[in-house]
Design a protein with these regions (language model features):
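Transmembrane alpha-helix termini and helix-breaking/packing motifs in multi-pass membrane transporters
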Residues: 2-3, 57-78, 138-139, 143, ...
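Hydrophobic core of transmembrane alpha-helices in multi-pass small-molecule transporters
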Residues: 9-25, 204-218
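Cytoplasmic helix-loop-helix junction between adjacent transmembrane helices
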Residues: 16-52
Length: 309
């Protein structure tokens, strides 16, 4: 469909449709993953899913390059072929998987619980940091260091390759050391990375920071597995939607606000990122050694009845 609307407003229209579908898919994927996976295997399997997604991205990038460079395929043809494949897969999935098994009946209404407050906070801060990386780190590569489209694409490919090779191992690490230690490692590393972004003057070093930055984000699996351990099984579907909404509060506000800061100081934008990482580090220390219902944070006791809230 996108290939038939090669205009500015056509791109806006098709992007909104794509965004609706993407976020619906991501919410369903998170909900089903946390419902179906056992708690002890969830970190590794979630890491494996990231690795599979990265392999798929590498494959699609390679095919697009092949069609464009070898066959000189137009944008219209590329979009038609890609859309046709996606439509075919959707029809196949609808025929062979007409419904999904629910291990527990899911709440059909929006669920907000006081005992999930730490999860909500970590999700919000994660969204803020993520937007600084997605929007401004790539922008830094182009504006300050003059990276070309092909060079930025190469960075994307390196990131996908890293996830392919190591995401499952990172999931295993989270399962072994626990969510608090894993998130502590992530946020400590991100503080240094964001500060380095603000100071870097070398293009190669900036590219290394970009890859390291992406590497640390794989540890964010720990937020999902922390929630799986403390949540009522009936809340998985509703809370997936809530978490995406909370995450995107930052996604709407941060790029606009820090875009104004960017015009004045590139470095200050990344220092804000370091501040968000520091706040995340502080918040992550409230995750108990063994999180569970009734023991959601270090501020609650394991035998508390607060999980009813």
């Amino acid at each position: 469909m996108t290939g038939f609307f090669p205009t500015e407003y056509g791109l806006y229209f098709t992007t909104v449709i794509m965004s609706i579908g993407f976020h619906y898919f991501e919410a369903v994927k998170q909900s089903l993953s946390l419902q179906w996976l056992k708690k002890e295997e969830a970190p590794q399997i979630l890491g494996r899913l990231i690795a599979i997604g990265s392999v798929t991205s590498l494959t699609v990038y390679s095919l697009l390059w092949f069609f464009i460079e070898v066959f000189q395929a137009s944008f219209l043809i590329n979009f038609l072929v890609s859309g046709g494949i996606c439509l075919g897969l959707a029809i196949f999935m609808g025929m062979y998987f007409p419904s999904f098994e629910e291990k527990s009946q899911q709440n059909k209404s929006i669920v907000l619980r006081k005992r999930y407050w730490l999860y909500y906070l970590l999700t919000f801060l994660s969204g803020a940091r993520r937007q600084i990386f997605v929007v401004f780190a790539a922008f830094l590569m182009v504006e300050k260091f003059g990276y070309s489209v092909s060079e930025v694409t190469l960075l994307f490919l390196v990131n996908y390759a890293f996830n392919w090779l190591f995401a499952e191992k990172i999931g295993q690490l989270i399962g072994r050391i626990g969510e608090r230690r894993a998130l502590t490692l992530e946020y400590t590393g991100l503080i240094f990375v964001f500060v380095a972004y603000g100071l870097v003057e070398n293009a190669t070093l900036a590219a290394c920071l970009y890859v390291i930055d992406h590497m640390f984000f794989a540890l964010a699996i720990g937020i999902k597995t922390y929630f799986q351990k403390i949540a009522d099984p009936a809340d998985m579907a509703s809370s997936a939607g809530v978490s995406f909404t909370i995450n995107h509060i930052a996604a709407v506000v941060i790029p606009a606000a820090l875009g104004l800061v960017w015009l004045w100081s590139h470095a200050l934008v990344f220092y804000f990122g370091a501040m968000f990482a520091l706040l995340s580090l502080i918040a992550s220390q409230l995750i108990p050694r063994d999180p569970m219902r009734g023991n959601e944070t270090n501020l609650t006791s394991a035998n508390s009845l607060g999980y009813q809230a």
